[in-house]
């Protein structure tokens, strides 16, 4: 298992949290996704053999949030 913290500067409310966590929960291999509204980050615990960072970023961006290049 790997843990990735992804900065998402546009996070600002509970709707953002619900939207992003819900999108990540649908990805096979994601064990847990947690949005920190105050820090504007998403922490994801996932099986790196099943999913990669690119898929996580894509799921966040599909919800309408920009993820800056790392």
Label each residue range with its predicted role.
Residues 1-70:
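Flexible metal-binding regulatory segments at protein termini and peripheral loops
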